[in-house]
Amino acid sequence: MWLGPEEVLVANALWVTERANPFFVLQRRRGHGKGGGLTGLLVGTLDVVLDSSARVAPYRILHQTQDSQVYWIVACGSSRKEITKHWEWLENNLLQTLSIFDNEEDITTFVKGKIHGIIAEENKNLQPQGDEDPGKFKEAELKMRKQFGMPEGEKLVNYYSCNFWKGRVPRQGWLYLTVNHLCFYSFLLGKEVSLVVQWVDVTRLEKNATLLFPESIRVDTRDQELFFSMFLNIGETFKLMEQLANLAMRQLLDSEGFLEDKALPRPIRPHKNISALKRDLDARAKNECYRATFRLPKDERLDGHTGCTLWTPFNKLHIPGQMFISNNYICFASKEEDACRLIIPLREVTIVEKADSSSVLPSPLSISTKSKMTFLFANLKDRDFLVQRISDFLQKTPSKQTGSSIGGTKASVSDPAPESLPTPQEASEPPASPSSPLSSPPSFSTQEIPTTSQGLLKVFQKNSPMEDLGAKGAKEKMKEESWNIHFFEYGRGMCMYRTAKTRELVLKGIPESLRGELWLLFSGAWNEMVTHPGYYAELVEKSLGKYSLATEEIERDLHRSMPEHPAFQNELGIAALRRVLTAYAFRNPTIGYCQAMNIVTSVLLLYGSEEEAFWLLVALCERMLPDYYNTRVVGALVDQGIFEELTRDVLPRLSEKMQELGVISSISLSWFLTLFLSVMPFESAVVIVDCFFYEGIKVILQVALAVLDANVEQLLDCNDEGEAMTVLGRYLDNVVNKQSISPPIPHLHALLTSGDDPPVEVDIFDLLRVSYEKFSNLRADDIEQMRFKQRLKVIQSLEDTAKRSVVRAIPGDIGFSIEELEDLYMVFKAKHLASQYWGGNRSAAVHRDPSLPYLEQYRIDASQFRELFASLTPWACGSHTPVLAGRMFRLLDQNKDSLINFKEFVTGMSGMYHGDLTEKLKALYKLHLPPALIPEEAESALEAAHYFTEDSSSEASPLASDLDLFLPWEAQALLQEQQEGSGNEDTPERREEKGTSPPDYRHYLRMWAKEKEAQKETIKDLPKMNQEQFIELCKTLYNMFSEDPMEQDLYHAIATVASLLLRIGEVGKKFSALTTKKPRDGAHSGDPNSATEEDEPPTPKLHQDPTQECQPPAAGDRQAKASGDMHLGKALQDSHVIVEGGSGEGQGSPSLLLSDDETKDDMSMSSYSVVSTGSLQCEDLTEDTVLVGGGACSPTATSRAGGTVDTDWCISFEQILASILTESVLVNFFEKRVDIGLKIKDQKKVERQFSTSSDHEPPGVLG
């Protein structure tokens, strides 16, 4: 590649000059190439340690002038071919021009200008739009690709110098972190270490420090432990590795590949060694942290942040912290965690202005909102730029009229009375009146969609005034007054100052009249509801009358959702719950519906309208409890792992006992999935939900630890899991809320488990207080760190479970051992994942649907199958292997979706590796019949397909069933049963004789098993093979034998067999001609070709004049092997051949004995045909090479090359089998056992090294 000219002071220290002229020098790196010796080792080590560019470009061209001592590098190359091309260009285009100059400075200036011009032209043509990676980074990426054989699609994120500990010896080298792989390379004094690990294989990633490994990063996979140390910035490296491993886990979980963010703004001053991908990942990490901290929608992007102070009017202080600006929000977080947090939606902002600076308030900024609140920020470093950014975002904010109608009233502090609060559904369409047909079934009209406009609790408790509740009512009034005072001091709505006082009020309990509003604010659901007016109503309308698996599951669980609560004992609450769950299933089909969602949603509906409950559910499922509610409840399993880890840390004695009893995994899943709603009385659990919406998952973990802590002694005395579950169940049943104004609702679990001596009641507020006192040291970032660690374990455990499930689903008669099947699965999965990494447009294979059964989740397409087939098949056919692989793929692809799953893949492999000679030959035979054979491979294959599909429909089912390469066994048996049933008219009578009751499923299973066995045993149902298909089979056999040690013996044997089969086909043609003369109403022959033959003209005579013989193609004859011709000719002349099944039916036709004279007469053309088939090289057997039998000059078929092919000629599988059995060398070849384990190991090595084709020369210093 051309380089911008740079000075080189020492031109010959580590370089050898190979070519020179008066103006340029071509040099090679010392030690590169052959015979580097000690110098090569030293230079190679130096290049690796110093990360020299000479490692990837060992050739260079320098510009020099005669009197100057300064050299200028103008080009470098990774191979001699590349550098020679540049050298020749310089000689041809510059040498004559440079000789004209008199001044050497002018020469150098001209050369530099010319080179800069070439580089600019190349960049204009070749550089992709938006490529902003620095030159040094591109060089590192080139080294990585060359060293590890990575394709262009693999992007380098960053690279670091570090040590890799191999045993007790550290190897200094370079760690390359790509989107999909971790790579390491070291070369020290001839010792080379090259390592590639896929991120999806990582099972553990942690940063630790021990005496042996000071500040190291540990990377575990299923079969190795790797340690890296001596990083310049270990924190940054580990954070990036975490992020990349997380992306890989996400890919395994829901098949979301990494997509570069094209909208990421370019930096004003590009960093020297930071790639665009690294900036992208850094921005993602910041965005995720920003959204999680302030509970913002998933599409919110952080624009920037700056240090500042915020004036807080409630305590008259300037609180230091950080201001965060994004496209829709201005947020503030104090340095002290609980001091203050603020969220200002730009839709609420009315005025942003610079205030007058003073010594007390330097660079202040005032922001006013529609709710008459003013926020004063100060100590802003770049106030003018900040104001401009906010102004830009305000211009893009939706119209102010929409904003005021949505959020203006709720953010007001002028009327703190809760009764006058407008409900959030004012943001969308007017709510339906209570008299709307809510109690009717879901078959209502789409013009008037009924939705509940208020919480169900208000509907069912509106007749019980608070004054009648005595002390509880007074307590509730006090709570409401406390919150109203808080709203007056700290603001109300989204712009409220959130402080330690807010948390204190939440822990004391949210009054029921404010619960729905505060849940919406604290969870961030209010923001999404306001910005998507009418979205829920639209979803409800779209989902009306639509049925799916999710809607069926929802209907099944509707009546199990809080059945003890009066709101869900009638159709009013149930219909509302149905609509919310169905709408969410339509919004997020990847989740659809998951158990426990109904319990949580029913509680949300008690305190808010349907639309509010819907958006709270969105916040819960997609942000606050990520991956909880999917088919594999991964998120809950991850937090369960965190809970176990915390139990080990804070309750070590109990942890051992619980592990021994296996209790934690049983209890904690329901606690986390339902937020204690399913295990605790409703009025108590809802207080935990209050805290959860304010604090997040931290509260659930704290309460769970407090529950265990309160029952330590009793749990330690338990002898089994059931006893421990009873202890915890009775404790939770008696957690009460004495302040609740709701009528007590008996807990269903409590009704079932209450005993004679109920335990002491526990107040929920006492439980919460204890949980905060003992376990409040949990931090959100610590929980996220633990989540990452547990996510690796959980997802890899689920992948192992999937592997075992898939292997168990493979039938026992497939022939492979469990270990072999597991190895094959890993190879198959790796090939699928490779398509996700670099698959381009293979969209069908790339996107995996995790909701499918395990067997269907990983699938590969034809090109991927071709690669696996080439490396795993025992039938290596050289250049013909891809053709055979394509046929095998078409044979296995039953549903014609151009993808095959693991079961189909293993079935194909089994056909080649296991079974006797007959089974293997059957597999090979089918590869040369439709649908495996396609017209592009053989001209007459299309005719053959019509021949077998139209004229012999009765043969279709045996073709698709034998060898179990086609339909699943149940479908085969059902199809066979239907066919037999249609032919047996007396079946109903027979059933009536047996009895009037229909047979049970076991009867059909027995029938299917019998039919399957029968089909496996028969070989007579296979369709016949015509002449051109037979020629293709001979080609395949020839190529298959070309790499065998017994090559010549196999050639001779297959030539003999082919000549025999050609004569059998000719004799069969004579019998076919005789059958055509029979009357049409004669007995029906079992020959599938009879219908065709009756309609065709009489077949020409077998014996033809020698002058009418077709001439062989000259090209093929010139390249035929002479030795093969001699063997074949002798074999044809000396053989007495017994032919069975002359009619081609395999039905036991009379045997015929052919004399030598008949053989010579009949085989005048066959001898040439067999010689061509048996002795031509693979590359000679093209589609233009015509191989014909004795009657090949029949005018009924014409090949593409102008020769002729006899379509009347055909043979059966039995004839091929019988002929091959006459040659022991062929029998031995097909019965030879091949160990697939060795081929799997080789394939894994290939995938680990990624030895893709590369134009670069191999390194010459790898001694």
UniProtKB/Swiss-Prot annotation:
Its main location: membrane. It comes from Mus musculus. The modification Phosphothreonine is found at residue 397. The record marks 556 as: Arginine finger. Residues 880-915 form the EF-hand domain. Disulfide bonds: none annotated. It is found in: Membrane. Residues 142-209, 288-356 form the GRAM domain. Keywords: GTPase activation, Membrane, Phosphoprotein, Repeat, Transmembrane, Transmembrane helix. The modification Phosphoserine is found at residues 412, 433, 436, 464, 1254. GO terms for molecular function: calcium ion binding; GTPase activator activity. The keyword Transmembrane helix applies. Residues 397-449, 977-1002, 1075-1126, 1139-1159 are annotated as: Disordered. Gene3D superfamilies: EF-hand, Pleckstrin-homology domain (PH domain)/Phosphotyrosine-binding domain (PTB), putative rabgap domain of human tbc1 domain family member 14 like domains, Ypt/Rab-GAP domain of gyp1p, domain 1, Ypt/Rab-GAP domain of gyp1p, domain 3. The arginine and glutamine fingers are critical for the GTPase-activating mechanism, they pull out Rab's 'switch 2' glutamine and insert in Rab's active site. SUPFAM superfamilies: EF-hand (SSF47473), Ypt/Rab-GAP domain of gyp1p (SSF47923). The gene is Tbc1d9b. May act as a GTPase-activating protein for Rab family protein(s). The record marks 595 as: Glutamine finger. Residues 509-696 form the Rab-GAP TBC domain. The chain crosses the membrane at residues 669-689. This is TBC1 domain family member 9B. GO terms for cellular component: membrane. Residues 987-1002 have a biased composition (Basic and acidic residues). It is a single-pass membrane protein. Residues 422-447 have a biased composition (Low complexity).
